[in-house]
């Protein structure tokens, strides 16, 4: 079985299924530090990454941007001094798809190698 951080995103259309209530616990177990947030009735995955300064936060933001471009799946990114908030959800289905969990796991992999983490 492929782990989330090794998986690749699949094309997600408006008729793609959202992650089911039955799938949710197992997927969350694989990304334990991520939180579910609900905004405008849309379930999203969110995590805050802390850095020693803005330079390292920006470098991490750019690294996440690179994996997002490579997979064709893009997060919400809020870059602040010493902090980056990453939010994954699937716009086309207005909720969570397996792709979001894949990208959250891949974001964690990027964070492991990021310089300047607190």
Swiss-Prot record:
This protein's record includes keyword Lyase: yes
The keyword S-adenosyl-L-methionine is annotated on this UniProt entry: no
Keywords: Lyase
InterPro entries (alphabetical): PCD_sf (IPR036428), Pterin-4-alpha-carb_dehyd (IPR050376), Pterin_deHydtase (IPR001533)
GO biological process, one term: tetrahydrobiopterin biosynthetic process
Gene3D superfamilies: Transcriptional coactivator/pterin dehydratase (3.30.1360.20)
UniProt GO molecular function: 4-alpha-hydroxytetrahydrobiopterin dehydratase activity
Broadest EC class assigned to this enzyme: lyase
SUPFAM superfamilies registered for this protein in UniProt: PCD-like (SSF55248)
Reactions accelerated catalytically: (4aS,6R)-4a-hydroxy-L-erythro-5,6,7,8-tetrahydrobiopterin = (6R)-L-erythro-6,7-dihydrobiopterin + H2O
EC number from the UniProt entry: 4.2.1.96
Family the UniProt entry places it in: Belongs to the pterin-4-alpha-carbinolamine dehydratase family.
Xref: NCBIfam families: PRK00823.1-1 (NF002016)
PANTHER family noted in UniProt: PTERIN-4-ALPHA-CARBINOLAMINE DEHYDRATASE-RELATED
Protein name: Putative pterin-4-alpha-carbinolamine dehydratase
Native organism: Pseudomonas syringae pv. syringae (strain B728a)
């Amino acid at each position: 079985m492929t782990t989330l951080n090794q998986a690749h995103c699949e094309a997600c259309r408006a008729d793609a299924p959202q992650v089911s209530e039955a799938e949710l616990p197992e997927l969350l177990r694989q990304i334990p530090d991520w939180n579910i947030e609900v905004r405008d009735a849309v379930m999203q995955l969110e995590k805050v990454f802390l850095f020693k300064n803005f330079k390292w936060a920006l470098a991490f933001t750019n690294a996440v941007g690179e994996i997002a471009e490579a997979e064709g799946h893009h997060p919400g990114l809020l870059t602040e001094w010493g902090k980056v908030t990453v939010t994954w959800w699937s716009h086309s289905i207005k909720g969570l798809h397996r792709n979001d969990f894949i990208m959250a796991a891949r974001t964690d992999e990027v964070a492991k190698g990021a310089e300047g983490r607190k």
